[in-house]
Swiss-Prot record:
Cofactor note: Binds 1 potassium ion per subunit.
GO terms under biological process: tRNA methylation; tRNA wobble uridine modification
Boundaries of every TrmE-type G domain copy: 216-378
Function as written in the Swiss-Prot or TrEMBL entry: Exhibits a very high intrinsic GTPase hydrolysis rate. Involved in the addition of a carboxymethylaminomethyl (cmnm) group at the wobble position (U34) of certain tRNAs, forming tRNA-cmnm(5)s(2)U34.
Name of the featured protein: tRNA modification GTPase MnmE
Coarse class of the protein's main subcellular location: cytoplasm
UniProt keywords, alphabetically: Cytoplasm, GTP-binding, Hydrolase, Magnesium, Metal-binding, Nucleotide-binding, Potassium, tRNA processing
Localization (cell): Cytoplasm
Superkingdom in the source lineage: Bacteria
Binding site for (6S)-5-formyl-5,6,7,8-tetrahydrofolate: 24, 81, 120, 455
Annotated family: Belongs to the TRAFAC class TrmE-Era-EngA-EngB-Septin-like GTPase superfamily. TrmE GTPase family.
PROSITE patterns assigned to the protein according to its UniProt record, in alphabetical order: G_TRME
């Protein structure tokens, strides 16, 4: 536990007026401040109703005082909470009183940072506090709560323990060569390595789902000119975000619209129609469209259901096939069902391709698309599954997987125990970055500075 020399104070509730406002204090002076502000000795971990006093003994406000001696507190330090009325003037007066008594204004996220430094939370749990506050849907809030309760961290720790066991075995064999262990022939090493790689892939998949719920999914609408891409964007956005005409090539640049489906964030990107063109401006738009396709979480490939080429849309554009994400991230949209003989509906092929027939103009079938996008974002997860994750977590998991892949290759092709041991060490270090076991101070500063003041 790291003993703080400074006492910090901040308003812990949201800005503005409210029924209740909370001022939070943490540090070695919290106990003295409890007596000075309340005018009496407070019993630990009990709520005391009474006045909050200024330096002259005048009443600032009335409310509840709660004192939590460390280490049994949120930060691991002595903590004082003053719960009064939620007026900004009253709360500012309480903060000023604490500043007079020797505290300083807390930095954003400093309470959570102290909890992390005092081993009350690991880094993934601390980040989950901010994720829970910022959650834009019930599912995102549930995932953040599970991360705060340690679900993500437990999964990472389990992977780390498996890596440590494998490292001990491999490095012991290296240190005692007289045992003459053949790493390639030793099925124990290969079996453990395969097991940890499989479990890491599972965690990566669930973390990716959690990150989509937290950050939102980027959906790119792509297709031929005049397929109804801009009409689909407008239908999803619920407003005229894009210009719609019968003239092919109206959209020449990338248009971005941020929407919510049942509180779940969605970043929808409308792109220029994919076609060969001599128009310089339109050509730039097509290049940007292909770039957006390559960066998308999901691509909605829109085809005009009344056009002859709609029968086999995936064979139309080699450029799209080169730039698209993995096939499982492409949804085929057969638009203009109101002008064709096709029925509104959703079909899933044996190989997992989803096709939705709809009409962007009338809105028929649009609810099917919304439900499909929600499912792609993990909306159907139960309360007992899923956890919140961030982009930095995904990168750490990716690098850990890359190290294990390299180690596996070294083992299979070279039987190289020394190189495998180094790859295992690197994988463990990348996993440690998630929970804060191997996290640089500058990264910690950036993470906690993004928190609310008072958290």
């Amino acid at each position: 536990m790291q003993a703080a020399t400074e006492t910090i104070v901040a308003i812990a509730t949201a800005q503005g007026r409210g029924g209740v406002g909370i001022v939070r204090v943490s540090g070695p002076l919290a106990g003295q401040m409890a007596v000075a502000v309340s005018g009496r000795q407070l019993k630990a971990r009990h709520a005391h109703y009474g006045p909050f006093l200024d330096a002259g003994g005048q009443v600032i406000d009335e409310g509840l005082s709660l004192y939590f001696p460390g280490p049994n507190s949120f930060t691991g330090e002595d903590v004082l909470e003053l719960q009064g009325h939620g007026g900004p003037v009253v709360l500012d007066l309480l903060v000023q009183r604490c500043l007079e008594l020797g505290a300083r204004q807390a930095r954003p996220g400093e309470f959570s940072e102290r909890a992390f430094l005092n081993d009350k939370l690991d880094l993934a749990q601390a980040e989950a506090i901010a994720d829970l506050i910022e959650a834009s849907s019930e599912q995102a809030a549930r995932n953040a709560l599970r991360s705060l309760q340690g679900e993500f961290s437990r999964r990472v720790h389990a992977l780390t323990e498996q890596l440590i066991s494998l490292r001990i075995y491999v490095e012991a064999a290296i240190d005692f060569p007289e045992e003459e262990i053949d790493f390639l022939a030793d099925g124990h090493v290969l079996g453990l390595l395969e097991k940890v790689r499989t479990e890491l892939s599972t965690v990566q998949r669930e973390a990716s789902q959690g990150a989509l719920l937290r950050d939102g999914m980027t959906v790119v609408i792509a297709g031929r000119p005049n397929a109804g891409k801009s009409s689909l964007l407008n239908a999803l956005a619920g407003r005229e975000a894009a210009i719609v005409t019968d003239i092919a090539g109206t959209t020449r640049d990338v248009l971005r619209e941020h929407i919510h489906i049942d509180g779940m964030p969605l970043h929808v990107v409308d792109t220029a129609g994919l076609r060969d063109t001599e128009d310089h401006v339109e050509k730039i738009g097509v290049e940007r469209a292909l770039k957006a396709i390559g960066e998308a979480d999901r691509v909605l490939l829109v085809v005009d259901a009344t056009a002859p080429e709609a029968a086999d849309p995936f064979s139309l554009w080699p450029e799209f096939l080169d730039q698209r994400p993995e096939p499982g991230k492409v949804t085929l949209i057969r638009n203009k069902a109101d002008l064709s003989t096709e029925s509104i509906g959703l079909e899933e092929s044996a190989d997992g391709h989803v096709t939705i027939t709809l009409s962007a103009r009338t809105g028929a079938g649009l609810e099917l698309l919304r439900e499909h996008l929600k499912a792609c974002m993990g909306f159907e997860q139960t309360a007992e599954s899923g956890f919140s994750a961030r982009r930095r977590h995904l990168e750490a998991l990716r690098l850990a997987g890359q190290a294990l892949e390299h180690g596996h290759s070294q083992l299979i092709h070279n039987g190289a125990g020394e190189l495998l041991a180094e790859d295992l060490r690197q994988a463990q270090q990348h996993l440690g970055e998630i929970t804060g076991a191997f996290t640089p101070d500058d990264l910690l500063g950036r993470i906690f500075s993004s928190f609310c003041i008072g958290k």
